[in-house]
Amino acid sequence: MIKSPKFTHSKKDNNKAQGRSAHLTAIVVSLVLSIIMITISVFNVSAVVIDVSSHDGLIDWNRIEEHVEGVIIRIGYGNDIEGQDDKQAIRNMNECERLGIPYGVYIYSYALTSDEVTSEINHTLRMLQGRSPVRGVWFDMEDADGYKESNGLDVYKDGELLTDFCIQFIEAMDKEGYKTGVYA
């Protein structure tokens, strides 16, 4: 069985975080929207699309609906284990469908091997369960927390291997009929 890292927090940590969560979420959402708006004006992009995950908490989609033209929703991270599903993914997809907001999805990859990519492919397909996200299915290859590097993958030296992982994911999603890309 392939295992991915587990992240846990104590109840005390969660209580502290809750007090700051709403304020920090508002700041982060404002910054993200500002960056998106700057990108739009610089590159003449015609759509405002935001990235959301359980880190954004319980989103009031009725308020966001009029400000976005699309959403990219994190559906999970790592291997095909329910504990690594994004806790808000199903709700976020349902809300976008209810309100007619075009959305795509992404999985944050922790893959170190081809077998782990296969597990992440299965994770993605399980979470989609027949949905058809019009903004595509994305393979997030960032290493924001340093997991890949701390486990021996170097983005500069192992570029060919990481490219193979991306190709493996894209080919599997294409075979299932999804528009697919790499989110990095």
Could you say what each language-model-derived stretch is?
Residues 169, 181-184:
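Conserved acidic, small-residue-rich alpha-beta core segments centered on
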Residues 1-47:
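Gram-positive cell-envelope targeting signals
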Residues 48-176:
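Substrate-binding cleft of extracellular glycoside hydrolase catalytic domains
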